[in-house]
Design a protein with these regions (language model features):
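Conserved internal helical-beta-strand scaffold that buttresses enzyme catalytic cores
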Residues: 2-247
Length: 248
């Protein structure tokens, strides 16, 4: 079952088709970013027990999500920058030849989404319409990822407005929880392919691919080529009960 795609861009459609053939989900759902779709996904997550609805009087709109005890942090020793030249990965990163890494990981993804739904998440890092914004598409088998990407990015069909119907300039993010096996957990960046692969984790820092993976690692490579610098930071807005907002 495949819901209607949100773009005519052949590069996006071809890649999603390839990832679907590899991971073999039962269903493919394109995320349009609408409130109706997000509310439905929240309800589904609550009904399956993946998330717990907290006291809505004290914490309105808040859901509680837990990962497995072996999956509660980023894994630096399993995080790789895979570019052709080892020196380009930088002195503080792990490196492996891109072809060797893909040969190792591809069998892990084969059929990893059987019995599950693949969510196709278009998103923009930066305001829609901004010449500085960068577009990504993440495919995942996690509702948690969808709901958090909705918070952390400009998620939904409007992201394709920045990309257009012909451009190939988007970051391809492939994520599957698979078996959440810590011995087969990898978070891999392929800068020269504009791609990120994450497998066997459900923890935010490893699976929200617009975060560290794109905004810091892939963006550093993009910035090097395009003459800008990637700055990884947080702007926090704190809202008082009277409605005043202070930004930190």
């Amino acid at each position: 079952i495949i819901t209607m795609s949100l773009t005519k861009n052949p590069n996006v459609l071809k890649w999603v088709e390839e990832m679907t053939a590899l991971t073999k989900p039962d269903k493919v759902v394109w995320i349009d970013g609408s409130k109706e779709q997000i509310d439905a996904l929240k309800a589904e997550a609550i009904s399956t027990g993946e998330m717990i609805e907290l006291n809505q009087e004290k914490l309105p709109g808040c859901l509680y999500h837990r990962t497995l005890p072996n999956d509660v942090a980023r894994v630096e020793d399993r995080t790789f920058i895979c570019c052709k030249n080892k020196e380009d990965a930088g002195p503080t990163n792990n490196w492996m030849d891109p072809d060797e890494m893909k040969a190792m990981l591809t069998p892990m993804y084969d059929g990893a989404m059987k019995g599950r739904t693949m969510y196709v998440i278009p998103y923009s890092m930066g305001p829609i319409g901004s010449p500085l914004a960068k577009v990504g598409v993440e495919v995942t088998d996690s509702i948690y990822v969808v709901l958090n990407m909705n918070i952390m990015t400009r998620m939904g069909k409007q992201a394709f407005e920045n990309l257009g119907d012909e451009s190939n300039d988007f970051v391809r993010g492939l994520h599957s929880k698979a078996d959440v096996d810590p011995e087969k957990r990898y978070i891999v960046q392929f800068p020269e392919d504009n791609a990120i692969w994450s497998i066997n984790s459900a923890y935010g820092g490893n699976v929200l691919l617009g975060k560290k993976c794109f905004a810091l690692r892939i963006a550093s490579y993009q910035g090097k080529n395009e003459g800008w610098m990637a700055e990884h930071m947080l702007i926090l807005g704190v809202k008082k009960p009277d409605g005043e907002v202070k930004y930190i």
